[in-house]
Amino acid sequence: MTQPVQTIDVLLAEHADLERRLSDPDLHSNPDEARKAGRRFARLAPIVGTYRKLMAAREDLETARELAADDDSFTAEVADLESRVAQLDTQLTDMLAPRDSHDADDIVLEVKSGEGGEESALFAADLARMYIRYAERHGWTVTVLDEITSDLGGYKDATLSIRSKGDSADGVWSRMKFEGGVHRVQRVPVTESQGRVHTSAAGVLVYPEPEEVAEVQIDESDLRIDVFRSSGKGGQGVNTTDSAVRITHLPTGVVVTCQNERSQLQNKARALQVLAARLQAMAEEQASAEASADRASQIRTVDRSERIRTYNFPENRITDHRIGFKAHNLDQVLDGDLDALFDALAAADKQSRLQQA
């Protein structure tokens, strides 16, 4: 077993401490702290459970070997227990492999149109709907924070917040973190009169959302905050007050807009959360070469040559070029049936992490 005993001892102690804290009513007077503790407990529970099963199986194996020394009828039981111990040992090693520290986090997701004009914007809207439907299948909450629509109702740019409702160790980020990159579509555009298949692209950016804005250092003096009237599809005004908020982080030039909440105060709070997520991602890029390489796989410019996935409508085929995944159920995928693809991406990521360990 590759993990050191001290690591297990530390995790067992942390698990016991969290169990004690979660039984304390005072903790639940602070919902954010309770949720954070609950998520960590959910992360540790299967590890602790597997470790205890392994210890019990080892004791049973030792007993069976002692009995088999005097009675051959126990030989088969020894073989079964040896197999179980090996299986649990491997399972525990997998659980202790390096894990993304943001896996339990919620996300901010941006879709942007690129090459292809109106068709690209329509495809960007298709991607946004795909993610919304996937989130709905999992009981997650989706909020459209900002949207810039095209003449035909597509998305030039849209920002979504996707949040889970439970304390699962595998949160929204663990499932959707691989979506960042350029997505290419091959189909006959609605604007095409000759029936020819065109290729266009849209981009997706995904950021883990911090539990609290305070977790990310943001100096108020570094912010320029502008307010304006919210607008609906096609640029039509839907609010007679200046409730929309645009925040510019002057040192980095990052701009975040939020206009879909009901009040200026709510829009400002959500915009700050999105800004915190983006600044956190930038800080991690600078701090870690690995994180920088991962983020490099996301879009810098929406260029078809940087594609991570192709959606081929004539063949009803989806292809993820990073892992060679192919499936002929594009219609179902666009309706939010993404679990098979996400499972394959997660398995490839897990294998990579085990190799690093």
Swiss-Prot record:
Matching SMART domains: PCRF
Record keyword Cytoplasm present: yes
Maturation and modification: Methylated by PrmC. Methylation increases the termination efficiency of RF1.
UniProt superkingdom: Bacteria
Cytoplasm among keywords: yes
Subcellular location: Cytoplasm
Modified sites of kind N5-methylglutamine: 236
Alphabetical UniProt keywords: Cytoplasm, Methylation, Protein biosynthesis
Entry-linked InterPro entries: PCRF, Pep_chain_release_fac_I, Pep_chain_release_fac_I_sf, Prokaryotic/Mito_RF, RF-1
Gene Ontology MF term list: translation release factor activity, codon specific
GO annotations of cellular component type: cytoplasm
Function description: Peptide chain release factor 1 directs the termination of translation in response to the peptide chain termination codons UAG and UAA.
Family in the record: Belongs to the prokaryotic/mitochondrial release factor family.
Name of the protein in its database record: Peptide chain release factor 1
Organism of origin: Mycobacterium avium (strain 104)
